[in-house]
């Protein structure tokens, strides 16, 4: 597969996955708990696949490539927490760690994006997208920590999920313009 096509497909796969996961985290959703879990699982699998494809589309080792790999690892960590029959605390910890790995992965692309003499509008949108994804994932991780302490963190998770989805969508749109 051509690297540009791989990056484009990976970008949209990841964006659609984040939207599915955000829908799953929406409190007023009409889906039952099983459907929400399945949507979140599918969303995280799509995000992991998309990030892996985006990383594979880059020939050279860059912070952006490493960041995409780290995001794929983070999503895979969340997936393992959903699929493997651990106790609830272990599942929550895997989700927290997976979200925080994704946050760091999104942030790792920023130095590459900022390392230019002339910043275009596409570069600015990519920066915004990466920042939004990093912030959204960090909020999701924070919500998990809050919930582990027995407090209500669902609203923070909801907001973080949609912030991440907006960032991924922006980056997919930029990739489409290339």
Please give the residue ranges for each predicted region.
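Glycine-rich, hydrophobic membrane-spanning regions of integral membrane proteins that mediate transport
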Residues: 1-131, 138-162, 169-178
